C-alpha cells in the first residue's frame, strides 16, 4: 500500500461524520484511489454501518466500484440495510451476492440476511437461506443456528425453530433465550417454562433476558409459585434492580393476583420509567381498583413522568370495572385536552363499556358514533354485551344489525343475541337465531382454565376428560357442588345468564365448566387454607361466579380468578367485584 493510501485509511479510521467523509472522498478521487480495495472497504464500512453514515451514499460507492467486491464489502451493505427501515434491500443485495462469481457468503452474511428475513416476515426466503447454510457447512455454528431459530420464531414457525434448536450441537445462553422467547411470544407458555427447566438440567444459567421472558409466561398462566422462584433468582444474580426486570416482576405479580407483591417491587425501585407506572396502573385497573389507579396516575404525573396511551387504558379499565363513570369521562377528556394523546379503538371501547356497565346504553351508542372508529366491530360487540346485561332488546338489535353489516361474523355475537331474545321471551326470534348459528356452522371459542399446583400448571377445558385424574376430579366436583349448594349456591339458567363467549352452559348443578374443574382439582391437591389462583380465557359466567362465591364460603378458601375481563377475589362468599362485572 502506497503512503497516500495509508494516510487516507488512517483518516477514514478517525472519521465521525458524513461531512468529513465527503472531504476525504474528494481527496481519494483527486488522487485516483477510488478503486483501491482497502480505501473502498473503509469508505463503504463507514457509510453502511456507522450511526452517522448514509446507506444511499454506500450504495452509490458500491455501484461505481470497478473491481469485484469482497465478501466483507457485501456484508457491510447487507448488514447496513438489515438494520435500516428498508430490510428488503438487504435481501436484494444478498441475492446479488449469490450471483457474484467471486464472493461467497460467510457466517456473517447469513446472520445479517436472516435478520432481514426476520423483519420482512418471509418464510420462503428463510427456508432458502437455511438450505444455503446447510450447503455451506455453517449449520453447526451456534450464532448462525441461533439466527435461524430467531428467524423461524419471528415468522411463527415454532416447530421448525424448535427442530433447529434441538439439532444444535452446542447451545449457548442466547440460543436458550431465543427459544424461550419464541414459546412465550406465540402463547406456548407452558413450553417456555418447561424449556427453562431443561436449560437448568443442561447446566446453563439464565440471565436478566431469560427471566423477563419467563416472567411474561408466568403472568399469562398465573404461575405465581414459579414467578416467586424467578424473583429469588433475580435477587441471587443481582439483576432485580434492572428497570426492565422490575417491570416484568410488577407485571407478573399484578397478573397473578398479588398486588401486594407488585407494590413491594415498585416501592423498592430506585429508578422508574413509564412502563413501571403503567404496570401498576393497569394492575389496579384489572383488579377493579379504579380509585387506586387514579391515585397512582396523579403520583405519576407529579413525579414528572409523562403518561402515554397505555396509561389511560389502565385508568379507563379501572374506572369501568368500579363503575366510576364521572371519573372515567374526566380522564378520557384530559387524555387529549391536557396530554395531547389521540384515543384509539381500545380507549373508545373502554368508554362504551364504562357507560354500558352503568346502564347508560344511550351514552354508549353516542360514544360509538362520536368516535373516529365507529366502523370497528369491537365497539358494537361491547355495546351488544351491555345490552345483554341490561336486557335492552331494542339497542341489542341495533348493535347486532351493525355487526352483520360489517360482516364481523363471530359466534359469540349470535350467542349474545340469542340470550337477549331468550330474556325477552321472544321465542320466534330465539329460534331464528339458533337456526342461523347452525346454518353458518358458527363455533364458539372453547373455555379453558389454568391452575398452578406446586411448580406445575394444569389446563382444563369445558367438559374436559383428557386429564389423567379425570375420574377423580369429576367425583370431587360432585362433592364440591353439593357442599356449595348446602352453603346457599343455586345453579342458574345458562340461557338467561350466559355472558359474552362464555363456556357452553348446561344449566344444571353438575355443569363441567373449565373453572369448576380447576377449582375441584385445586381443592383436591392443596392443603386447607391454600389460596387457589385460576386463569380463564373467557369472561366467567354468572353461574360459575355464584358457584365460586359459595365454594369460598363452604371450604373457607380464598379463590382468585382472572378472566378475560378482570380479576375476581372470592373470600367468605363475597367477590371483590361486588357482582359488578
From Swiss-Prot:
PPR repeats lie at residues 70-104, 106-140, 141-171, 172-206, 207-241, 242-272, 273-307, 308-338, 344-378. Keywords: Repeat. Transmembrane segments: none annotated. Residues 455-485 are annotated as: Type E(+) motif. Residues 486-581 are annotated as: Type DYW motif. GO terms for biological process: RNA modification. Residues 379-454 are annotated as: Type E motif. GO terms for molecular function: RNA binding; zinc ion binding. InterPro entries: DYW_dom, E_motif, Pentatricopeptide_rpt, PPR_At4g14850-like_plant, TPR-like_helical_dom_sf. Pfam families: DYW_deaminase, E_motif, PPR, PPR_2. Belongs to the PPR family. PCMP-H subfamily. PANTHER family: DYW DOMAIN-CONTAINING PROTEIN, PENTATRICOPEPTIDE REPEAT-CONTAINING PROTEIN. This is Pentatricopeptide repeat-containing protein At3g56550. The gene is PCMP-H80.
Amino acid at each position: 500500500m502506497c503512503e497516500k493510501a495509508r494516510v487516507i485509511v488512517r483518516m477514514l479510521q478517525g472519521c465521525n461524520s458524513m461531512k468529513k467523509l465527503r472531504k476525504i472522498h474528494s481527496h481519494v478521487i483527486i488522487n485516483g484511489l477510488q478503486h483501491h480495495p482497502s480505501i473502498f472497504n473503509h469508505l463503504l464500512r463507514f457509510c453502511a454501518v456507522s450511526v452517522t453514515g448514509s446507506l444511499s451514499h454506500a450504495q452509490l460507492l458500491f455501484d461505481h466500484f470497478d473491481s469485484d467486491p469482497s465478501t466483507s464489502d457485501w456484508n457491510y451493505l447487507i448488514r447496513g440495510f438489515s438494520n435500516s427501515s428498508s430490510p428488503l434491500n438487504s435481501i436484494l443485495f444478498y441475492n446479488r451476492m449469490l450471483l457474484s462469481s467471486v464472493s461467497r457468503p460467510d457466517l456473517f452474511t447469513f446472520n445479517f440476511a436472516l435478520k432481514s428475513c426476520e423483519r420482512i416476515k418471509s418464510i420462503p426466503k428463510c427456508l432458502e437461506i437455511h438450505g444455503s447454510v446447510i450447503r455451506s457447512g455453517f449449520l453447526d455454528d451456534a450464532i448462525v443456528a441461533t439466527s435461524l431459530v430467531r428467524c423461524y420464531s419471528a415468522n411463527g414457525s415454532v416447530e421448525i425453530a424448535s427442530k433447529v434448536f434441538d439439532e444444535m450441537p452446542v447451545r449457548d445462553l442466547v440460543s436458550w433465550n431465543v427459544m424461550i422467547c419464541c414459546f412465550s411470544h406465540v402463547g406456548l407458555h407452558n413450553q417456555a417454562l418447561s424449556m427453562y427447566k431443561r436449560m437448568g438440567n443442561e447446566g446453563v444459567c439464565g440471565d436478566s433476558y431469560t427471566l423477563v421472558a419467563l416472567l411474561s409466561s408466568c403472568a399469562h398462566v398465573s404461575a405465581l409459585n414459579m414467578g416467586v422462584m424467578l424473583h429469588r433468582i433475580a435477587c441471587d444474580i443481582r439483576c432485580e434492580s434492572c428497570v426492565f426486570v422490575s417491570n416484568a416482576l410488577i407485571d407478573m405479580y399484578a397478573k397473578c393476583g398479588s398486588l401486594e407483591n407488585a407494590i413491594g417491587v415498585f416501592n423498592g425501585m430506585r429508578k422508574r420509567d413509564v412502563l413501571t407506572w403503567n404496570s401498576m396502573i393497569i394492575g389496579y385497573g384489572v383488579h377493579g381498583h379504579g380509585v387506586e389507579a387514579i391515585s397512582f396516575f396523579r403520583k405519576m404525573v407529579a413525579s414528572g413522568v409523562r403518561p402515554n396511551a397505555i396509561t389511560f387504558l389502565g385508568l379507563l379499565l379501572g374506572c369501568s370495572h368500579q363503575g366510576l363513570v364521572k371519573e372515567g369521562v374526566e380522564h378520557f377528556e384530559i387524555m387529549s385536552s391536557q396530554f395531547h394523546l389521540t384515543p384509539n379503538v381500545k380507549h373508545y371501547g373502554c368508554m362504551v363499556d364504562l357507560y354500558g356497565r352503568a346502564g347508560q346504553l344511550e351514552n354508549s351508542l353516542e360514544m360509538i358514533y362520536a368516535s373516529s372508529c365507529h366502523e370497528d366491530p369491537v365497539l358494537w360487540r361491547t355495546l351488544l354485551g351491555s345490552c345483554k346485561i341490561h336486557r335492552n332488546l331494542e339497542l341489542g338489535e341495533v348493535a347486532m344489525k351493525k355487526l352483520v353489516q360489517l360482516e364481523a361474523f363471530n359466534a359469540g355475537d349470535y350467542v349474545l343475541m340469542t340470550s337477549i331474545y331468550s330474556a325477552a321471551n321472544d321465542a320466534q326470534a330465539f329460534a331464528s337465531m339458533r337456526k342461523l348459528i347452525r346454518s353458518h356452522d358458527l363455533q364458539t371459542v372453547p373455555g379453558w382454565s389454568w391452575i398452578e399446583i406446586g411448580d406445575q400448571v394444569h389446563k382444563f377445558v369445558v367438559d374436559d376428560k383428557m386429564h389423567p385424574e379425570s375420574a377423580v376430579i369429576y367425583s370431587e366436583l360432585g362433592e364440591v357442588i353439593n357442599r356449595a349448594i348446602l352453603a346457599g349456591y343455586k345453579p342458574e339458567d345458562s340461557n338467561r345468564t350466559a355472558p359474552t363467549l362464555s363456556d357452553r352452559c348446561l344449566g344444571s348443578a353438575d355443569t363441567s365448566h373449565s373453572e369448576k374443574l380447576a377449582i375441584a382439582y385445586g381443592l383436591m391437591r392443596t392443603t386447607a387454607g391454600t389460596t387457589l389462583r385460576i386463569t380463564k380465557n373467557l369472561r366467567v359466567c354468572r353461574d360459575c361466579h355464584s358457584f365460586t362465591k359459595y365454594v369460598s364460603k363452604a371450604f373457607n378458601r380464598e379463590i382468585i380468578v382472572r378472566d378475560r375481563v378482570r380479576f375476581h377475589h372470592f373470600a367468605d362468599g363475597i367477590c371483590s367485584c361486588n357482582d359488578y362485572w
